[in-house]
Amino acid sequence: MMGYQSNFQPKLFYYNVNLDQRVPQNHSLRKINEKIDFDFIYKEVRDTYGINGNVSIAPPVILKMMLILILYNVRSERELMNTIPFRLDWLWFLGYDLDDEIPNHSVLSKARTRWGVAVFKRFFERIVWQCIEAGLVDGSKLFTDSSLIDADASNNSVVDTYSLKRHLNKSYRRLEERLDDLKVQKSTPANSRYISTTDPDASVTRHSGGKSKLRYKTHRAVDAKCEVITATHITTGSVDDGDVLREMIEIHEQNTRKSVDTVVADSKYGTIDNFLLCHKLGVKAHIPSFEKTHRGSGRQKGIFPKEAFSYNPDTDTFTCPAGQILKRRNYHKKRKHYEYKAPSKICVLCELRERCTRSKYGRSLKRHIQQDELGRMLAYARNREAKRDIKTRQHLSERSFAQSKRYGYKRARWRRLWRMEIQDFLIAALQNITVLIRHSEEKISKSNAQIGQIIRTQRVKWEDFSFGSLLMRLFNQFTMALGLV
């Protein structure tokens, strides 16, 4: 018989409503609550609060709200606060009841300003150390990469600092003071000349021939064992990847308390300075050479590479494919290399000129003052182990960034560099928490499987000595004694 729903009449009071019973045992927030201790933040932010005045929202609750904001990729903090009363799982995670008052959305922005970046950095470091204690981090091999993040600002907010000062009004006094500090010259790069009035820390960046946008850049170090993020760093989008390798190694060693043995990265990190840095630190650099990777493009297409020239250490000269001698001419102090050249009048008459150089001054080569050490590092970067690590990096690092997309990392939630650092620490911490929970569940499943195997083994042994088995053995012995078998 079909049933009909009666007219809904809301109850004035609800009895025996237990939020803990409403949240499933396998809920992600329940797992996070079991694994992570949020009470540490009381000690971290104690000095940022006074002893008088109104009582604030509990710091662990604020941190949990920010995690929910990232975990569920909620569009705004205002929307988060409006949604919390309707989500029983969020209420349970935050320690609220059905009729508790939800704080204003401004609580989160004020907390970020009050706490600063250091608190969120400490939270990320605690999660990394928790992964280390769980045996999920090896720490000896460092995989590093970077990715661009769109700033929360439009290209229309970019202004030219040359013409801006003539049109500034009273509301732009702060920006004018900032421009005076920059001391911009006409020969400076574009990001020193152009600035966004909405987000001054973001830089105009173009990626892979696409459109120029205001962007930041996140640099990330991932451990190969369980893909735990051991270090993360935010810069403006114009910073080269290779310039932060030293800092990434230092952050990784500080967070893991382990020395790096091998660094694996793409060719953007394969600069001479980075190879020599790894040599100085005693670290193996499994990094493709930037020069060799991008060789054969542009003006260098179809030109003899440096390896086609033979170096004679006795005479300190190079010999070109045509047999001509290139002698040492100049020393570049800033780049720390010598320049070797052949006479231009010889290059002009050479039959191999079209394949050797397009310069009217003839072919020139550069040799670093630490070329011997550099050559050994480049040789290490071409061995079989290095090629295998470079191939592993392609999917390991890209997968880490791909997982971040579900948390909205491709676009900045807030403006200014220090707020971007907070967003980056929260996303990286959440990814590590996910790894921690997943491997804990796998460990429990493995233990349960082992226990089940032991029970099945003991059951088989018990069945071997059961009463029915004993009768069968006696019957077989009896028939054999009578000669019936």
Residue ranges, per PLM feature:
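Short secondary-structure boundary/capping segments within folded domains
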Residues: 20-23, 54, 210
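Helical catalytic core of nucleic-acid polymerases
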Residues: 59, 84-87, 91
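Basic, short loop/linker segments at the boundary and entry of helix-turn-helix/winged-helix-like folds
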Residues: 25-67, 72, 369
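Anion-binding and metal-coordination hotspots
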Residues: 5-6, 73-86, 96-485
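Generic alpha-helical segment signature
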Residues: 12, 25, 38, 58, ...
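Hydrophobic alpha-helical membrane-insertion signals
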Residues: 1-30
